[in-house]
Amino acid sequence: MKTIAAYLVLVFYASTALSESISENLAWNKEFSSESVHGVFVLCKSSSNSCTTNNAARASTAYIPASTFKIPNALIGLETGAIKDERQVFKWDGKPRAMKQWEKDLKLRGAIQVSAVPVFQQIAREVGEIRMQKYLNLFSYGNANIGGGIDKFWLEGQLRISAFNQVKFLESLYLNNLPASKANQLIVKEAIVTEATPEYIVHSKTGYSGVGTESSPGVAWWVGWVEKGTEVYFFAFNMDIDNESKLPSRKSISTKIMASEGIIIGG
């Protein structure tokens, strides 16, 4: 394991609590190799203000966020009134959608859990470009570039974010430190709970830009945090993807690494 102090200035703002130290654990690469995947995993421990990754260079490289952007999109929607509250029902118009689980009325939590793209495209259109740009700037979210269309800039447009920036944003959300109401931050945090056991709770969101090609692969994400006792572990995973069959690797690799670190059960 080697310390990569030079990356601190590159990937974190000085005010970020998780910027005290960054180290590389190259042993994690075996999990990527075993599944023939090229990617990165970042794990940050709140109590020690430290982060570990298998690839510091890739961790500071920005990629399109895809559906991980549903986290800030939901918060911005709540802040602007595009989403009234967590009980608002987003009506299905009866038209066929890309995925069957999207073809029903959904509330906020349900829309996030099934990653309903049409719902969040509707939210983004109601927020509008001016307010969307304002909040991405306030959140220091990636490059904050909404070029490419108000309802698709995070799917196929110009928005980019690194794994390090993802954990920075998630830490701010966890601490209710984003420039948004505490009540709305709590709503979003509850909406992204994906696993709850007696030992730990996982808040997370996946993302997937599409497979791309071998020469220009797409990107698959899994980001979130684990609350375990008094400790909080923030994580961000991304990988190149040129075959949809590899999509499960985003969770399986992350789970194996976190299990090896004694954080969750699995692997």
UniProtKB/Swiss-Prot annotation:
* Chain segments annotated as coiled-coil in the UniProt record: none
Record carries keyword Nucleotide-binding: no
Pfam families tied to this protein = Transpeptidase
* Record-annotated active site: S67
Q: Which reaction does it catalyse?
A: a beta-lactam + H2O = a substituted beta-amino acid
Q: Which GO terms describe its cellular component?
A: plasma membrane
Entry protein name: Beta-lactamase OXA-5
Q: Which organism is it from?
A: Pseudomonas aeruginosa
